[in-house]
Amino acid sequence: MNQGKIITVSGPLVVASGMQEANIQDICRVGHLGLVGEIIEMRRDQASIQVYEETSGIGPGEPVVTTGCPLSVELGPGLISEMFDGIQRPLDRFQKATDSDFLIRGVAIPSLDRKAKWAFIPKLSVGQEVVAGDILGTVQETAVIEHRIMVPYKVSGTLVAIHAGDFTVTDTVYEIKQEDGSIYQGSLMQTWPVRQSRPVAQKLIPVEPLVTGQRVIDTFFPVTKGGAAAVPGPFGAGKTVVQHQIAKFANVDIVIYVGCGERGNEMTDVLNEFPELIDPNTGQSIMERTVLIANTSNMPVAAREASIYTGITIAEYFRDMGYSVAIMADSTSRWAEALREMSGRLQEMPGDEGYPAYLGSRIAEYYERAGRVRTLGSQEREGTITAIGAVSPPGGDISEPVTQNTLRIVKVFWGLDAPLAQRRHFPAINWLTSYSLYQDDVGSYIDRKQQSNWSNKVTRAMAILQREASLEEIVRLVGLDSLSEQDRLTMAVARQIREDYLQQNAFDSVDTFTSFPKQEAMLTNILTFNEEASKALSLGAYFNEIMEGTAQVRDRIARSKFIPEENLEQIKGLTQKVTKEIHHVLAKGGI
């Protein structure tokens, strides 16, 4: 422990002298109030400290004390359903302890509740050899999540004691005799530095799709479990709603939602909505599998920078248990702005648009902690982290540095489009500019698992939308009637795909989520209509007669998005109805 004194205060940056024994990334207590700070630069005996709390009233001459430890998070039972700030302070217990609706400075509250007791059930017995990552026992944390207590990293040896019963997170639950003869006494909790990724046995290629229930994503731009996706878009295009929808309905075990520098009412929406929503995969409340990290725009800027790392470290902990985890960061642009502010105060050489030169490597560090892995431990298991980051480019200009550096790393780009949002087409993901590099892997995975021709259907649907885009210029110049019958059909089918399939109402109880079998049935109906109508045109039928003769069945296809999942056979039955109606048009002569 080293004590120095403040010589300069510049917003969230404090410079202290007499810190020659301190190290970069050490946590400090700053000033008489004991504010939490982290050393981000050392020059001789002077340390530049990033303070995670408001620094007003702090002045030169006040003491700075280092703890000798890096910024770390507590990992153990009690994380799920909890809401933390950027440095893992529990906000509900903070409010009760301080009796204030605001963050009182200098208050230290442990991240995990020290009084709560958890029922520990051992899975191993005394005398067994254990290595780092082995599961010693379980705690039923919520109705959905079984918390697996693991041997900490760099600990291995013979299990000499393990106890069943109710324990707090600090009680000794097991003892391991290590190779050097020392006894390691372990509890239900472990700590981990947030800026250091947790080790794994092996990184694997992600192949299984993350089913989000959003048709435009699952069909055209899928992301895999263990993949990374970016959602850039201008103000009002629906970035936060897309993130909320994925957090609500994705087929993952655990969701970490990081509200980083966005508006406070968006986190309020999460807190109000999530407890009432039922997870379609488990039948339980969505909060039973969610961890919230709130670092809204009116909280200290420096803590934004830490909040992303706090979230990904908690995600890695649950991944190591063998769970599939999704982490939402809303928004990484605000995080990058925090980096820019600290870089400016350190008087570093600026890069593009004032962002630090190391912006690209910091963004890469975050997204590279996602992935599908084989975890440490003698019991073989796999875990995944899917990272989905919203990007808020000023004015929707995706050529700015944060978006460009993000797109170099992620493999999925869901480009939100202001004109689509203005036309009230939501999700406003532009199908012509967005892309997914997982499309082929996911398509072949689904074809193999479902024994269906899914990837071919997706290719045909996208070809229709692209053909529509190339015809739109002609239509604007000379009108729809100037097109050939086949091209008019293409325009009509493309409109069906856009309005009846891609457009989705997040606030409708049925349309908000679409399972994969329902998506396949809906898309099959539209493509069947296109195929049968094309045949009818080639046999001499007129476009107008086909449209008039199939008006009723097309209306039923349009309404199929509002048919509940349990009535899936109604949607599948429309395929034969489409064929029958078009054959009926041909039987009448079609001329």
Curated annotation (Swiss-Prot):
One of its GO terms (molecular function) is ATP binding. Its EC number is 7.1.2.2. ATP binds at G233, P234, F235, G236, A237, G238, K239, T240. It is an enzyme of class 7 (translocase). GO terms for biological process: proton motive force-driven plasma membrane ATP synthesis. It comes from the Bacteria. It catalyses: ATP + H2O + 4 H(+)(in) = ADP + phosphate + 5 H(+)(out). InterPro entries: ATP-synt_VA_C, ATP-synth_a_Xtn, ATP_synth_asu-like_sf, ATPase_a/bsu_AS, ATPase_F1/V1/A1_a/bsu_N, ATPase_F1/V1/A1_a/bsu_N_sf, ATPase_F1/V1/A1_a/bsu_nucl-bd, ATPase_F1/V1_b/a_C. PROSITE patterns: ATPASE_ALPHA_BETA. Pfam families: ATP-synt_ab, ATP-synt_ab_N, ATP-synt_ab_Xtn, ATP-synt_VA_C. Keywords: ATP synthesis, ATP-binding, Hydrogen ion transport, Ion transport, Nucleotide-binding, Translocase, Transport. Gene3D superfamilies: 2.40.30.20, 2.40.50.100, Bovine Mitochondrial F1-atpase, Atp Synthase Beta Chain, Chain D, domain 3, P-loop containing nucleotide triphosphate hydrolases. GO terms for cellular component: proton-transporting ATP synthase complex. The keyword Magnesium does not apply. Belongs to the ATPase alpha/beta chains family. HAMAP family: ATP_synth_A_arch. Produces ATP from ADP in the presence of a proton gradient across the membrane. The V-type alpha chain is a catalytic subunit. This is V-type ATP synthase alpha chain.
